[in-house]
Regions:
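Active-site-proximal substrate-binding groove within the catalytic cores of carbohydrate-active enzymes
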Residues: 94, 100, 104-106, 110-120, ...
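Aromatic-lined carbohydrate-binding/catalytic grooves of carbohydrate-active enzymes
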Residues: 188-336, 344-351, 357-362, 366-368
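Surface-exposed beta-strand edges and their flanking turn/coil or helix-capping segments
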Residues: 124-125, 167, 252-254, 298, ...
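Functionally constrained cores in energy, signaling, and assembly domains
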Residues: 25-27, 273, 281, 310, ...
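Residue-level detector of flexible, active-site-proximal loop/helix-junction positions
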Residues: 53, 290, 400
């Protein structure tokens, strides 16, 4: 304790403003739960609260590293050559809401629940003879809500495997763990994913304003499927068609029906679906409920997401041009319209909705106000509806909030070799949710019909 001359009364102190922290021990005694409430003074707006600042630090001389679920998982080493400050937005470029630190073979875990949370991973040089090392890794946690919470757990001896196992228990308590065994009780068809060969052929390809071309007709894909069954002897497979929709791949969403006339129309697609399912395989179709093209018959600005300045949000540049982005709550109108019709026409037993598990959770402003938490809720609603309608459901990317509602993540394995100097890819997603969801590479890396032999 130290004494000092009393300060004059502060208007801020008198209004009881500030950030108030509360700590309590976790029930199992493994660590602490920390929560805060922020009360900014009148006329002030809360930007962020940083309850952890350069915390859980570890040194190069302590064999230190950080375990972070960037995509499938990554380790950063304290003795890495590069200095950096990496910012991870929860469920943006970050697949699970935790981070781990290891020091001399002893591990700690921090985890949280709010998507409006950002983790900073710092790697800095220390220029001091008293520091005990020359390089330091540390974490900072920033939150933007007026209240928030996180947990810190001491795990004892261990590394990233023990960190993932400890987080599995926390994820289970949040209701995020839904295993294949549990899913199979409601839909036995999910077991057809086990060991299945996966293929995603395109059919109709069209750039905006062009006539386009048919890369494979439904009849040609019927011959491919027959070859896989009769000659190669596939006992299980997942065939998902891209470009089957009315105007071809990535064109005029959300107006997908009828099936591409150039590829064989509704009749040809229905026949292919029946054939593939009769082999005992999974047959799926590629769809999208994020992008809305302004040349689509259903286009209307009332469905769009908006920036703070009132301009509609736009997506990337795809075959159909640059789409606008639909607000996830508004997009459900088209999912409720389209998916029952697709089920009645083609009876797929699997479905793929692009981008849903891949793009960061987004914020939309007036006139369509949507928070990150709201965006997550409606994307979970979309995935759950597709799963209930067709049985097996998958999407691009992979993130833990989707685990109860999705059966496979396409693309997360494509990140397995993308490690920069001073880091290493590790299977954190597989360790936490490996018995809940199948992990696949991106469609561009899958078997093609030209190489099926």
């Amino acid at each position: 304790k130290a004494s000092a001359p009393p300060l004059p009364p502060s208007p801020i102190m008198m209004q009881r403003t500030g950030t108030f922290m509360h700590f309590e021990q976790l029930p199992d005694g493994s660590g602490i739960s920390a929560s805060y409430t922020a009360a900014p003074a009148d006329g002030w707006t809360l930007t962020s609260v940083t309850p952890l600042d350069h915390a859980l630090w570890t040194l190069d001389t302590e064999n230190g590293y950080a375990a972070v679920p960037e995509s499938i998982g990554k380790l950063y080493y304290a003795d890495g050559s590069e200095q950096f400050n990496k910012v991870y937005q929860t469920y943006g470029n970050y697949s699970m809401a935790f981070a781990g630190a290891v020091k001399d073979g002893s591990a700690m875990l921090i985890d949280w629940t709010e998507p409006d949370t950002a983790l900073n991973v710092h790697h800095s040089r220390i220029d001091s003879p008293y520091a005990g090392g020359s390089d330091q890794l540390s974490f900072s946690l920033s939150m933007t809500q007026r209240s928030g919470a996180f947990q810190m757990r001491v795990l004892g001896k261990g590394g990233y495997v023990q960190i993932a196992k400890a987080y599995r228990a926390a994820a289970s308590a949040r209701g995020l763990v839904r295993t294949f065994a549990q899913k199979a009780q409601e839909n036995p068809g999910v077991t057809k994913l086990y060991g299945a060969a996966t293929a995603k052929p395109d059919t109709m390809i069209r750039s905006r304003g062009s006539a386009g071309y048919t890369s494979h007709t439904f009849a040609e894909l019927s011959q491919v499927a027959q070859h896989w069954n009769d000659v190669l002897g596939f006992d299980r497979a997942l065939m998902t068609l891209g470009g089957w929709i009315r105007m071809g791949f990535d064109n005029q969403y959300p107006d997908i029906l009828p099936a591409s006339p150039e590829a064989g129309g509704n009749e040809g697609l229905a026949a292919l679906s029946t054939q593939v399912r009769d082999y005992g395989w999974l047959f799926g179709l590629h769809d999208n409920y994020q992008d809305m093209y302004d040349d689509a018959p259903s286009f209307d600005t009332k469905y769009l997401m908006y920036n703070k300045d009132g301009r509609p949000q736009t997506g990337g540049v795809w075959a159909g041009g640059t789409p606008y982005l639909m607000a996830s709550d508004k997009a459900m109108e088209f999912a409720y319209r389209n998916l029952p019709q697709v089920k009645d026409l083609f009876s797929p037993n699997s479905y793929f909705i692009d981008t849903t598990f891949n793009v960061p959770l987004a914020v939309s402003y007036a006139p369509n106000v949507l928070s990150r938490s709201g965006d997550m809720h409606w994307k979970q609603t979309l995935a759950g509806y597709a799963q209930d309608t067709f049985g097996v459901f998958g999407s691009e990317g992979g993130v833990e909030w989707a685990v109860p509602y999705g059966d496979y993540f396409e693309g997360i394995l494509s990140k397995k070799t993308q490690a920069e100097p001073g880091s290493h890819i590790v299977p954190l997603m597989e360790l936490v949710y490996g018995d809940c969801v199948a992990l696949y590479p991106h469609m561009s890396e899958k078997i093609g019909t030209n190489g099926y032999n």
